[in-house]
């Protein structure tokens, strides 16, 4: 039996949006970014990319049209994990790496909540790597914002699981010998149903990705390239620089050919490796260029595209939604199993408890 | 041929065989028969951690001990009166526990050269039965070809020889059921249901069971059968229940009586997994179970569910608690209701997964960074796991705190008759969720304070998402008193550390006085314990009293906080004995808290304490306290018919 069959059997509609069961604002009522701003002073370093993301999220949340009290932000430990304190929603700043597990319990216990996880490259990929891949595998309805600055900021500058090999940091004075993770490749390998990448400095793109992630039912993983001006300044410079970004960003748009550098370069299949590569469009022709299909149920091509991300200095990276497929969510199915059992029970809970305790081989002493 | 029937007041039987021989099932069936018959009973399953250790070897031996009586008993018994050994390894592994004169029934079929050598026997001990000084010289041995007779009894069903021989445990059960006058219908009913889909296996097992019974009745090898009358028990309806099942039922009941959905986040671990299995069956009570990717995720999900307004529960054993410690600290800091169940096993590290121990008390008390107090509740018997789970839930919800429920392998897998409670007798638990702050006359609403406290309990509000006006942020960083925002203020931290401790201490206001069993009122020695040692301590105390001496007994269900009157009670005795299956963890706490000279009785064999050894230790202390020599054996009243619960 396929997963889809299971959801049909449990009486779930085939498609739901991520926020469908979350109470909306009353008709005619609107919110602004200010409604989502808490009274707490924001304490990131001047110039930190986190400010831009916070502003974008505060600006975007009113667009969801949801009741503020039904939104919960859960974070782990790290600079970005202070995020929930600055939003006037429900929130929990939890422990290192465990936010996805806490959010899993929260999202499974309550269908009426919009659940967000804020995490960093150390939090999500190092200490919390296990929880991340299992959240993605289960496909719990939540959105994970993974702030990737490729460094440990809060502990003052050690290399992270996304730092490039050879990086000289406080804990690697002669260069890191660790092979970095590519978070998008990792998420696709875990068969995540929604995987995207965006950049802190491009508010428009960031907002559009957040919007798609929130609308997706299941675990949405959004990697956000985020600059740390203190310990890893300029890590994403090529993706941001006026003169370099066109050559560095490979924009992914569903249904469009994957071209960049003003249309001069395109992504084509590479028969030699079975993967994909960058080619001059002039040489291969536009017809040979891959048309991006984010809805492909097979993650193979999305994975191949994710490999175009430079592993060392980030001079090239695909940006956009790599994958977005419908798959039954863990929380919907767990609740459906429980509610089917609850609905099938006729007697009162006390009566049924009495029957449960008194079942099996019993004897009576008078 | 009519056989003699002899009256006994109690019997301890141990079934032992290879891990694959079905000894747990055999013991369990005998127990159910005895329970329905109306005997009081206690059981002690004992099995290796390996699912199938090498066949025929001593490490592969699995056993099940059942103690049943015509009166109230407290333990599974120190030493078996009867050993059923299905192979040489089972005989060798258990013979040392038998008192002189014990009955031994062996499956002679399995005493082959190969099996004897696997068990480490140079010569077949069955060949020297009756010889003084031989291996089996001191026992009443009955070699019976259980396998051969089983194969013969089931041949009409056309099973392979291997399948046919597998029914030998039912043959043995039938024989023992005859010997002790057990009712047969429950087992036939059980087999009919269990093997409903495989008629030939079903019929073969029933045939083997009946053949065993008939063999007992007709053979001249067994001249006597025994009768153990039902035990007087308080009126009510009873069932036999294991601790893990009772604990799972207690959690279901806590959900029903609090009107909260139960959410279990758990990772499989011996000996706690049964609770996960059981709770996963009870979705109709609104119970959600999540088998997490690891121990940490299990408790993480439970904390998330608790924040969402469910009764968050996580179940594990010692190694799992070690992994969950940081998350327990988070629940302490965020002051959320949470049940943490630790079914203790032998440690440290992986230790003895299938054996019992109570060496996690100090881990429960102190096993976290910082000042991180949690409430601790410990059940004292299998059936008591039900009430203890309800009590733990009451504390967690009322005081918004993690509660550690300390069960252990002995009561988790052991069973006893349990009077099924009336649902209306069970306590109710009020979640008391915070509601939206009232709008003032000027139209403004007061700022919600997530760390404001109830003056009586010092609990903070349980403010769940979805409640307008209560938006707030919690987390692991220190919280400012009242408003709950991050605070690095030194005075605030000192205050919050003390408040979190004071809240746990406040729980003592809600506890009943500690019951002290001191019938004469003249005892100078108090024996105090906690958890599963209740039975062995009670049995040891009985023996000392039987010998004419005074001794008092008290048992702690609440380990943190202690009952308010504990200090005063301890001060009232000259000597305090603290028996524990650890190196003196409660002793340490009592000494530190009350400055009393608590003396430990500490045995860590992975098995329940033996009542006889305990009785000797109590007697010694009574002798010291009263300045008289105490010899238990000489002082026992020979006319007494009351059980002493010790080895003969």
Predicted regions and their residues:
Chain A
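Glycine-rich beta-alpha junction loops
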Residues: 77-79, 149-151, 202, 225-230, ...
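Flexible, low-complexity linker and terminal segments
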Residues: 2-30, 39, 230-366
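ATP/pyrophosphate-binding catalytic subdomain of soluble kinases
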Residues: 193-249
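Active-site-proximal loop->helix
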Residues: 129-136, 154-167, 186
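Short coil/turn connectors at secondary-structure junctions
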Residues: 40, 67-71, 99, 110-115, ...
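Thiamine diphosphate
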Residues: 77-153, 207
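Active-site diphosphate/adenylate-binding microenvironment
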Residues: 26, 30, 34-95
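Conserved thiamine diphosphate
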Residues: 112, 160-213
């Amino acid at each position: 039996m396929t997963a889809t069959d299971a959801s049909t059997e449990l009486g779930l509609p085939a498609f739901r949006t991520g926020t469908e069961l979350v109470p909306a604002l009353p008709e005619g009522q609107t919110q602004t970014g200010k409604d989502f701003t808490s009274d707490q002073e924001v304490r990131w370093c001047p110039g930190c990319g986190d400010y831009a993301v916070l502003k974008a999220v505060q600006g975007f949340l009113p667009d969801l049209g949801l009741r503020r009290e039904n939104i919960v932000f859960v974070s782990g430990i790290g600079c970005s994990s202070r995020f929930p304190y600055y939003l006037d929603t429900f929130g929990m700043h939890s422990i290192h790496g465990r936010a996805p597990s806490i959010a899993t319990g929260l999202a499974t216990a309550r269908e009426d909540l919009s659940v967000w996880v804020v995490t960093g490259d150390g939090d999500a990929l190092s200490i919390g790597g296990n929880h991340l891949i299992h959240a993605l595998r289960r496909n719990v309805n939540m959105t994970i914002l993974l702030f990737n600055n490729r460094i440990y900021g809060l502990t003052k500058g050690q290399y992270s699981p996304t730092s490039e090999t050879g990086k000289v940091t406080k804990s690697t004075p002669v260069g890191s010998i660790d092979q970095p993770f590519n978070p998008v490749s990792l998420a696709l390998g875990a068969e995540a149903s929604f995987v995207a990448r965006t950049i802190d400095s491009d508010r428009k793109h960031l907002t559009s990705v957040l919007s798609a992630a929130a609308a997706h039912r299941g675990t949405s993983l959004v990697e956000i390239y985020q600059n740390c001006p203190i310990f890893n300044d300029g890590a994403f410079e090529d993706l941001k620089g006026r003169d370099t970004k066109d050559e560095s960003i490979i924009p992914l748009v569903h249904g469009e050919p994957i071209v960049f550098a003003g249309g001069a370069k395109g992504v084509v299949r590479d028969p030699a490796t079975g993967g994909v590569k960058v080619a001059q469009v002039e040489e291969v022709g536009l017809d040979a260029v891959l048309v991006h299909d984010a809805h492909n149920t097979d993650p193979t091509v999305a994975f191949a595209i994710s490999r175009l991300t430079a592993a060392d200095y980030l001079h090239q990276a695909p940006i956009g939604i790599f994958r977005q497929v419908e798959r039954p969510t863990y929380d919907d199915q767990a609740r459906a199993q429980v509610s089917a059992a609850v609905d099938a029970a006729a007697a009162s809970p006390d009566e049924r408890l009495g029957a449960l305790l008194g079942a099996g081989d019993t004897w009576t002493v008078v | 041929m009519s056989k003699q029937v002899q009256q006994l007041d109690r019997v301890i039987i141990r079934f032992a065989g290879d891990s694959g021989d079905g000894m747990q099932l055999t013991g369990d069936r005998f127990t159910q028969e005895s329970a329905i018959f109306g005997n009081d009973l206690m059981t002690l399953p004992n099995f290796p951690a390996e699912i199938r250790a090498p066949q025929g070897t001593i490490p592969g031996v699995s056993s099940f001990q059942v103690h049943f009586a015509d009166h109230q008993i407290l333990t599974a018994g120190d030493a078996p009166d009867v050993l059923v050994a299905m192979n040489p390894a089972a005989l060798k592994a258990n013979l040392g526990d038998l008192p002189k004169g014990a009955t031994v029934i062996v499956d002679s079929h399995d005493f082959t050269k190969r099996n004897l050598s696997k068990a480490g026997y140079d010569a077949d001990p069955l060949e020297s039965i009756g010889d003084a000084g031989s291996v089996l010289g001191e026992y009443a041995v009955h070699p019976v070809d259980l396998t051969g007779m089983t194969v013969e009894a089931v041949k009409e069903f056309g099973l392979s020889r291997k399948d046919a021989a597998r029914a030998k445990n039912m043959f043995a059960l039938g024989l023992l059921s005859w010997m002790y006058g057990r009712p047969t219908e429950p087992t036939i009913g059980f087999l009919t249901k269990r093997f409903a889909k495989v008629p030939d296996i079903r019929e073969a097992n029933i045939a083997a069971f009946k053949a065993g019974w008939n063999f007992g009745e007709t053979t001249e090898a067994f001249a006597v059968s025994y009768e153990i009358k039902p035990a007087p028990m308080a009126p009510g309806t009873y069932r036999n229940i294991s601790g893990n099942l009772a604990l799972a039922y207690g959690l279901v009941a806590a959900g029903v009586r609090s009107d909260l959905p139960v959410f279990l986040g758990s990772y499989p671990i011996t000996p706690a997994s049964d609770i996960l299995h059981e709770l996963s069956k009870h979705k109709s009570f609104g119970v959600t179970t999540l088998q997490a990717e690891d121990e940490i995720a299990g408790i993480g999900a439970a904390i998330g569910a608790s924040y969402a307004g469910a009764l968050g529960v996580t179940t594990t054993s010692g190694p799992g608690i070690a992994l969950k410690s940081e998350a327990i600290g988070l629940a302490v800091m965020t002051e959320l209701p949470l049940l943490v169940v630790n079914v203790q096993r032998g440690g440290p590290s992986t230790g003895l997964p299938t054996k019992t121990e109570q060496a996690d008390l100090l881990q429960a008390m102190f096993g976290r960074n910082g000042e991180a107090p949690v409430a601790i509740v410990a059940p004292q018997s299998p059936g008591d796991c039900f009430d203890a789970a309800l009590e733990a839930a009451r504390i967690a919800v009322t005081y918004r705190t993690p509660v550690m429920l300390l069960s252990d392998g002995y009561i988790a897998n052991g069973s006893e008759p349990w009077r099924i409670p009336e649902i209306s007798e069970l306590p109710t638990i009020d979640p008391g969720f915070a509601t939206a702050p009232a709008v003032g006359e000027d139209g403004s609403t007061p700022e919600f304070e997530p760390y404001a406290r109830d003056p009586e309990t010092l609990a903070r509000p349980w403010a769940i998402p979805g409640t307008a006006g209560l938006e707030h942020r919690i987390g692991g960083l220190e919280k400012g008193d009242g408003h709950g925002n991050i605070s690095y203020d030194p005075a605030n931290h000192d205050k919050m550390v003390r408040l979190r401790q004071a809240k746990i201490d406040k729980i003592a206001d809600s506890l009943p006085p500690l019951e002290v069993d001191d019938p004469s009122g003249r005892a100078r020695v108090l024996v105090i314990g906690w958890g599963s040692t209740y039975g062995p301590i009670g049995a040891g105390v009985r023996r000392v009293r039987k010998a004419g001496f005074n001794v008092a007994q008290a048992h702690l269900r609440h380990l943190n906080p202690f009952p308010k009157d504990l200090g005063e009670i301890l001060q009232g005795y000259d000597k305090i004995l603290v028996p524990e299956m650890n190196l003196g963890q409660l002793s340490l706490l009592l000494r530190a808290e009350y400055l009393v000279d608590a003396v430990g009785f500490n045995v860590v064999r992975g098995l329940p304490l033996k009542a006889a050894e305990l009785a000797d230790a109590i007697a010694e202390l009574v002798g010291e306290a009263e300045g008289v020599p105490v010899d238990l054996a000489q002082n026992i009243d020979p006319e007494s018919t009351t059980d002493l619960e010790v080895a003969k």
